[in-house]
């Protein structure tokens, strides 16, 4: 009977953790420098489990998901279970540690998915909970959580963002026709998927060749998600991007970063800066922007996921 009971509880834990992971996707790409985390507060008063509080990391990274969920649950959090997609924080920052908040609210059981590699947290969040007498169950749907949090985990461990290359090829292995601007290769379903990838990324990166050839805006165009456009990054060692480019036209709405090398015309750079364009001065290697160093710079800016949509030179 005990084994059956454990099996039932494991199924319940997986079901609510899956729901918490779906919730955490809501603000992917909008919570830097923090990851987008989902939290559910679930209690069972004898009639079956019921969600009494939910939270996702707010835009900008604060408040944390746990605080939002506890605020929604109120007194119903006492004696309840919290499902968290990432180990609760254990350090004092702009807000008190979420591990303490969960324990102080009377949560009696915490089910976690991914462990936090941040040395300020790593294992300490769960230790605080256990010391307070809270039952802790770790690594429920950990593989799924790690995949969703890959950008944050990679940035924490390797000091660089997760990089995803989007590349469309024709049946003969071509990505476009030189001098003919944008060429449509993919179908509607693939284009919509790319829009979702953009909406969940911290930044989109292209080379100056693509910027000059296609004059893209690199914004999210799915209805209802237009405000989810991530920062745009252009690899432009010599600052050849025209001030009339679409990327510059809407810089007041969507950030634009240009990675340049040394020796850029200061007056031309100042003109872009007056428009609101931000510059990343980075090293060059063999005449091109040094990507490893640039990735470190982007991670330092809090970017955890970068979608590369450049052409053959950048992709290579």
Language-model segments: residues:
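Short loop/turn microsegments at loop-to-beta-strand junctions
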Residues: 35-37, 52, 163-165
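Short acidic/polar active-site loop segments enriched in Thr and Asp
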Residues: 108, 304, 309
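Active-site ligand-binding patch in enzyme domains
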Residues: 154-158, 162-171, 175-304, 313
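Short, basic/aromatic recognition patches
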Residues: 12-32, 155
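Zn2+-dependent cytidine deaminase-like catalytic core
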Residues: 40-144, 231, 257
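Residue-level signal for inorganic ion chemistry
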Residues: 20, 38, 89, 129, ...
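Short, compositionally biased leader-like segments
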Residues: 1-19, 127-144
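Short, structured interface segments
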Residues: 139-156
């Amino acid at each position: 009977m005990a084994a059956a009971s454990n099996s039932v509880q494991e199924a319940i834990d997986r079901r609510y953790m899956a729901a918490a992971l779906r919730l955490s996707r809501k603000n992917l790409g909008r919570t830097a420098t923090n990851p987008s985390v989902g939290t559910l507060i679930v209690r069972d008063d004898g009639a079956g489990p019921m969600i009494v509080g939910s939270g996702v990391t707010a835009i900008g990274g604060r408040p944390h998901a746990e605080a939002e969920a506890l605020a929604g649950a109120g007194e119903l959090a006492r004696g309840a279970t919290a499902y968290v997609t990432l180990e609760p924080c254990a350090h004092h920052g702009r807000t008190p540690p979420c591990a303490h908040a969960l324990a102080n609210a009377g949560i009696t059981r915490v089910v976690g998915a991914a462990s936090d590699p941040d040395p300020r947290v790593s294992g300490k969040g769960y230790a605080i909970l256990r010391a307070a007498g809270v039952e802790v169950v770790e690594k429920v749907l950990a593989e799924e959580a790690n995949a969703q949090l890959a950008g944050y985990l990679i940035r924490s461990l390797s000091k660089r963002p997760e990089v995803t290359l989007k590349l469309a090829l024709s049946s003969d292995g071509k990505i476009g026709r030189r001098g003919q601007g944008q060429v449509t290769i993919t179908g509607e379903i693939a284009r919509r998927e790319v829009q979702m990838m953009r909406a969940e990324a911290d930044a989109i990166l292209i080379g100056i060749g693509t910027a000059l050839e296609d004059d893209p805006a690199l914004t999210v165009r799915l209805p209802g998600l237009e405000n989810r456009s991530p920062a745009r990054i252009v690899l432009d060692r010599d600052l050849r991007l025209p001030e009339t480019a679409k990327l510059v036209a809407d810089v007041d709405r969507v950030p634009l970063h240009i990675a340049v090398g040394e020796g850029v015309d200061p007056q031309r750079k100042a003109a872009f800066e007056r428009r609101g364009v931000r510059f990343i001065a980075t090293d060059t290697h063999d005449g091109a922007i040094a990507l490893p160093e640039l990735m470190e710079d982007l991670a330092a800016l809090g970017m955890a996921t970068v979608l590369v949509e450049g052409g053959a030179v950048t992709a290579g």
